[in-house]
Amino acid sequence: LCLLPLLTLSPMAAAQETVESYLREFPNQEQVKMMNTWLEKNEKGSFQFTGLVDPSDTTVVTPQATVDYGYNWFSISDGPAILTTPTYDKFLSVSVFDMKHNVPAVITNPTKPILLKRPSQAMPEGDFEVVELETDQGLVLTRMVVVENLDAVVASRSQFQMQGGKGDMQREVKQFSPETEKNAQAVIDTVITYVNPDDAFGRVSGDVSFLDLAAGVKLGQLGTPSDTVRYGTIMVDNTGAPLRGDATYVVTVPAGLYNPGGYFSVTLYGSDNKLLIPNDLKIYDRTTFSSEPNQDGTTTITLSPNGSGKNGI
């Protein structure tokens, strides 16, 4: 990965280089990598949309397959930015990330423009949903659930507009020795085995521990705080054995799992890269909208090598 001139490397004094300092820096490292990769093909302060994600899309790990994602990496170093969005009769969310992987806002079906600003910046006139960031650079990530209406979703993209957001995109990233990186990554991999996804992401610095945040970022970068999204990760079967690609499993989704206006999704990923798994049927997830529930309100989802079975993936 070539990070180009947008990445400023800062050597660390030996006394400062510790496993803990690496763990605290890791979310920033990953955000900068993702930002600079995106900026190689896109303009700061503008939107790029994925369409329906398939296994070839490696922009973000653990994506949802029946969602049209919109990405906009921006900088408010030179002043606030104003974001306007379309009106949508299904699920639409706007998540705002800073470079520390804080998520200061997740706004579902916005009803007014969103103002992105630093705490020291003056408020412009107008009625806004105000979001303050801890860093100049950040990401707006939009999600529009697709329910056999991709054409309408695509047509609404032009209504996502950002005024401003074209400031300085340089972001410092600290360097570490290979030994420190190896030791710190081993710590992250250990934390991943027991981290509660509900505790992995916060709105401001200090909401979650630096250990949980580092593990959360490695497990699923651009994850969202638990008051908006609840994550559940299943890596083993009911005997404790790792899930296998040549086996068949049945997952039961409980009734009453989500609030009015929300929905559930179950997605299958490869354990090696956390991306969607290629399959002939091109079915990568099951959601409230693409599953047939049971009479008791639960939903049975079948995971198998050929996608057979009720609500199969």
Predicted regions and their residues:
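Cleavable N-terminal signal peptides
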Residues: C2-L3, A13
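N-terminal signal peptide c-region/cleavage motif recognized by signal peptidases
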Residues: L9-P11
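A compositional/structural signature for long, glycine/proline-rich flexible linkers
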Residues: A15-I313
